[in-house]
């Protein structure tokens, strides 16, 4: 089902773990603050993208945590609905990580599967800290129709 294995909880009151497909601009929009506010709050380098698995501190001055979570969930559900409108998971395989392999490399170059989908199939793996030898379940997708 859409949204299954999607953990968007707020940690420690004002922090989240960045999910695949999210940008600083998304968080700023959902919170109704400027991206620069989040850059300062998190002591980030300007114009450097945030990473999947990274903890990000949030500013709830203009939006409640519940409203933020609703917006974030709607964004992710939209991505999944669009994807599953055109593709289905036909099978899975196990991939043992080799030195130098990253989620991005597996997602974009090796298997052509969205990073968020790999994350859904590996809920107990910290995809932000992958090391050689870790075994990932990779969903194999096919176009519908």
Residue ranges and their predicted role:
Residues 1-145:
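Extracytoplasmic low-complexity/disordered linkers and repeat tracts associated with LysM-containing
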């Amino acid at each position: 089902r859409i949204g299954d294995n999607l953990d968007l909880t707020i940690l420690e009151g004002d922090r989240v773990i960045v999910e695949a497909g999210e940008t600083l601009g998304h968080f700023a929009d959902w919170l109704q603050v400027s991206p620069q506010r989040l850059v300062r709050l998190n002591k980030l380098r300007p114009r450097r993208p945030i990473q999947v698995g990274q903890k990000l501190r949030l500013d709830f001055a203009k939006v409640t945590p519940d409203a933020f979570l609703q917006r974030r969930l709607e964004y992710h559900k939209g991505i999944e609905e669009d994807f599953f409108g055109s593709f289905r998971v036909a099978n899975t395989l196990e991939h043992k990580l080799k030195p130098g392999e990253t989620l991005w490399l597996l997602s974009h170059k090796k298997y052509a599967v969205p990073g968020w989908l790999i994350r859904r199939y590996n809920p107990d793996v910290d995809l932000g800290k992958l090391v050689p030898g870790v075994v990932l379940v990779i969903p194999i997708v096919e176009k519908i129709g």
